[in-house]
Amino acid sequence: MDEAEYGRFVDWDKMEAGGQEQSPKVLSCTDFQELKQMARQGHWAKSHTLRAKVYQKLIKEIPCRTVTPDASVYRDIVGKIVGKRSASSLPLPEFVDDRQIPSYSLNSEGTGAVRKIISCISNQFPDISFCPALPSLVALLLHYSQDEAECFENVSRILACNDPNRRLVDQTFLAFESSCMTFGDLAGKYCQGPHKLMVAVSEDVLELYSDWQRWIFGELPFAYITRVFDVFLVEGYKVLFRVALALLKFFHKVRGGQPMESNNVKRDLQMFVRDLNKCVTPEKLLEKAFAIRLFSRKEIQLLQMANEKALQQKGITVKQKRQNVHLAVHAENFTSEIVSVKEMRDIWSWIPERFALSQPLLLFTNREHGNSLSRFYLHCEGHEPTLLLIKTTNQEVCGAFLSTDWSERKRSGNKLSFFGTGECFVFRLQPEVERYEWVVIKHPELGKVNSSSADKEANSSQSDKDGIDPSSRLSPFLATRHFNLPSKTASMFMAGSIDCIIIGGGDGQALYLDPDLNYGRTSHCNTFNNQPLCSETFQISIIEVWGFKDNMNNDGAHSALH
């Protein structure tokens, strides 16, 4: 029997029937691109033994730290750790967050083995402080292990991966939380319809997205998680983001037209993923996942690092009540002459997650500080990012999220020069809501650059004297000054001088404001591929600029808490 060698922990009566002998018993492929296609196409999905041997091969090739516990270590310690206790009664360590162990059609020996292996992992990896995916990972790999010790060694190698460019499993709350924030960022950009629905029906969309890994490692049926894991072992962490975004898209497609209650949407999502086989095949799930044109692995890594840094700056490195992590726009604390609390919450759902940690902070309003561009700069410099809100005399409302400090304009002297990053976006709220993001998000081919020219530009424009590590500026999405993109006009984010402010450029300007902040104009521009944000020429009634209050550093501006 095919399962004899690797089926010791499996209850075969509960497993879905499937062809077992239709694939070769060895993996001869060594070319990465070919291996990637085989994984995506489910080449070893039909043979339990082949999949087991592929997993063994791929996991053995993971670069690990020098001292990584192996099967012999497990055999030495398991008796001491378990003692005379029943395996089924072993408590799970706190770092798995009391998550229920997915059964994955394991037999009673298998479910006990999961607890024994996790207990030994806890003993050998004292640096793990938060790893909710671990029970699912162990239960899955038990299917493809000859004994507990082999499973322990394979899990240990995944946890001990030391390739800085190959993120596999989050093992701290900081890493986990920043992953949730990164998923929220990606959902806002690549799943705008589903994200809008989640914001509308959820009291806390960030709390909802904190479950994104559980959808995969916990809720997905076994036939689906194995197909995902096939690709994950070849391509890495980015696959998980793709699959979770695809799940969100399918949920929106299937449930979007049905009434949902805010207190049930989290459970509804979990149930939808658990019963995914009722509406979506594993092939369709992966097809949808890989149809999403995500940013590069480098881009996502930079975004993750930025989110981690934001959490560290807030002192958030260990698990705590979520309301202490994400601070919402509270009705009793927020006052604007342009937008309502609900509208500000909608805007908050659009901004990068690391800034949603902060509260809105009023920096400038023409009602208090006057209609003067010089005063605008005076009150806004030193703050990044900022949120610009404009209300016209015709009661139209529009604005922009601006990623970069306005003092950056001084680098070019008196010359009007564009700066900013791909996180900038423009929007209108009245008469209808519409957001326009960087055109490269939907058309990544516009952002493809010659790597050598990008590196050269990055190194020349960002010197060590300003205290910025050039390696953190190699991304056209996060870099302050755009690189040699095929179309320069696709990266004209923001510019300012004593004579005007311009947001968005290339064959028009998304927003142009005069030096007295009295009049402006708006049109289509290449950077955001936007429609005019209001009447093409308009008179400003009210203008507000909001910053993001760092709770660790309360400066003199007007906080929305007052």
UniProtKB/Swiss-Prot annotation:
InterPro entries: Rab-GAP-TBC_dom, Rab-GAP_TBC_sf, TLDc_dom. SUPFAM superfamilies: Ypt/Rab-GAP domain of gyp1p. Residues 450-471 are annotated as: Disordered. Residues 454-468 have a biased composition (Basic and acidic residues). Keywords: Cell membrane, Cell projection, Cytoplasm, Cytoplasmic vesicle, GTPase activation, Membrane, Synapse. Pfam families: RabGAP-TBC (PF00566), TLD (PF07534). It is a peripheral membrane protein. GO terms for molecular function: GTPase activator activity. It is found in: Cell membrane; Cytoplasm; Cytoplasmic vesicle membrane; Presynapse. GO terms for cellular component: cell projection; cytoplasmic vesicle membrane; plasma membrane; presynapse. It comes from the Eukaryota. Residues 42-259 form the Rab-GAP TBC domain. A 1,2-diacyl-sn-glycero-3-phospho-(1D-myo-inositol) binds at residues 36, 40, 238, 242, 293-297. Residues 337-549 form the TLDc domain. Interacts with ARF6. The Rab-GAP TBC domain is essential for phosphatidylinositol binding. May act as a GTPase-activating protein for Rab family protein(s). Involved in neuronal projections development, probably through a negative modulation of ARF6 function. Involved in the regulation of synaptic vesicle trafficking. PANTHER family: NUCLEOLAR PROTEIN 7/ESTROGEN RECEPTOR COACTIVATOR-RELATED, TBC1 DOMAIN FAMILY MEMBER 24. This is TBC1 domain family member 24. It comes from Xenopus laevis (African clawed frog).
